[in-house]
Amino acid sequence: MVKMSTKLIPLSVPNLNGNEWQYVKDCLDTGWISSAGAYVNKFEEAIQNYTGVKYAIACMNGTAGLQVSLNLAGVSSNDIVLAPNLTFVASLNAISYSGAEIALIDVCEDSWQMDIDLLQNWLENNTITNFVNEKPVTREIASGKKIGAIMPVYVLGGF
């Protein structure tokens, strides 16, 4: 008979060592526990300084961050976004929220990442590129929709 362990495996256990407890208390005391407030501004400024960019935006989760990225790239309901068929649902939700159509590309057996050969094949057989105001615009032949983005998600995250 196998004896079950009673040892807890910590998963997403809050770690409020250091100043975190005070920061959480400050947020609760001031009522700023959502998308704005002094700590959000400090975080965005720290990211700007660390990365050397002019603008940074804090989002409530990865889905919102991906959606903002798609919006900033100009993706709209007249577009198609290509994504791997093995991905976290946030990627596809962000595309869906942008109004764009999703086209899934199979992943490579060795890496589980979007298969570049299949992507190239899909683009060569399903799209045409024209120049509008000296800028290339690639459209799906069947629908006429613009290829708004290719989202080659790293499926294994931080592993």
Give the label of every model feature segment.
Residues 13-14, 106, 155:
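Conserved donor-binding loops in enzymes that form glycosidic bonds
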Residues 110-159:
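Active-site phosphate-binding strand-loop segment of PLP-dependent enzymes
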Residues 58, 83, 149-153:
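A short beta-strand submotif of the Rossmann-like class I SAM-dependent methyltransferase core
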Residues 1-33:
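N-terminal "arm"/small-domain region of PLP-dependent enzymes with the aminotransferase-like
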Residues 36-80, 94-97, 104, 128-141:
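Phosphate-binding glycine-rich loop
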Residues 87-92:
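Conserved coil-to-alpha-helix start sites within the AMP-binding
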Residues 84, 101-111:
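Short beta-strand->loop structural element characteristic of the AMP-binding/adenylate-forming
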